[in-house]
């Protein structure tokens, strides 16, 4: 089933390429909702955007740790449009539906690789973003999830060529990628807690390939002591 994108929630760490996508959505008449730095970025493009805080009536708290974790956000993402009770509850609590969610994740692995402190690494464990990704991907029947900036151009092309509509197969493709992003992110976090290290190597099986070592070096080599 094709579904037209009429509202979008955007909350991203990396802003590259977001300007043209935001303009495309605006030109299609899509209502935009956003948070913090992303909202300011969109406002600076002279594009109308609604602050999530205005929707939830709660500010961002705990130094930004809690921004989007609210029933008015997740209800609008997870609602099943064909379920009367879902839609009645949205109406009762004045919750808008979100047809599109654009979100990426804090750079956890980059912080580890760059030698960040434990506190810096902990702060880069994304909570709200990963929850948004999973919620939107779960509800792909009604909601499109974009979890990687490399898909911005693809989404723009689909929106422009299909009059703002996406097919269910297209939404499922984006959802599949989103769950891969989510699982890979959690794997990196689990590896770090398990003491495994990701180290960049000079090249892969062939010189043109990128490769990394991931594991506990202490389990791979014998220690040599000099007296």
Model-flagged regions — what are they?
Residues 1-55:
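N-terminal glycine-/serine-/threonine-rich phosphate-binding loop
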Residues 3-7, 27-30, 45-48, 70-74, ...:
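Short coil/turn connectors at secondary-structure junctions
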Residues 37-107:
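Glycine-rich nucleotide/cofactor/substrate-binding loop typically near the N-terminus or early
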Residues 196-227:
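Long, structured protein-protein interaction/assembly regions in large complexes
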């Amino acid at each position: 089933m094709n579904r037209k994108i009429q509202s979008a929630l955007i909350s991203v760490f990396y802003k590259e390429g977001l300007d043209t996508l935001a303009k495309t959505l605006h030109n299609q008449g899509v209502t935009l909702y956003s948070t913090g730095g992303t909202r300011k970025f969109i406002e600076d493009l002279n594009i109308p955007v609604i602050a999530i805080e205005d929707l939830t009536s709660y500010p961002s708290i705990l130094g930004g740790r809690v921004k989007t974790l609210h029933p008015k956000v997740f209800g609008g993402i997870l609602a099943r449009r064909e379920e009367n009770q879902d839609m009645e509850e949205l109406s009762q609590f004045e919750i808008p539906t979100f047809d599109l969610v654009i979100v990426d994740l804090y750079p956890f692995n980059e912080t580890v690789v760059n030698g960040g402190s434990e506190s810096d690494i902990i702060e880069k464990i994304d909570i709200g973003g990963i929850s948004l990704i999973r919620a939107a991907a779960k509800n792909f029947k009604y909601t499109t999830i974009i979890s990687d900036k490399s898909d911005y151009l693809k989404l723009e092309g689909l929106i422009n060529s299909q009059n703002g509509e996406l097919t269910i197969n297209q939404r499922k493709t984006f959802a599949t990628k989103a769950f891969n992003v989510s699982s890979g992110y959690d794997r990196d976090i689990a590896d770090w807690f398990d003491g495994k290290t990701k180290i960049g190597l000079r090249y892969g099986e062939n010189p043109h390939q990128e490769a990394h070592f991931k594991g506990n070096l202490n389990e791979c080599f014998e220690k040599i002591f000099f007296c």
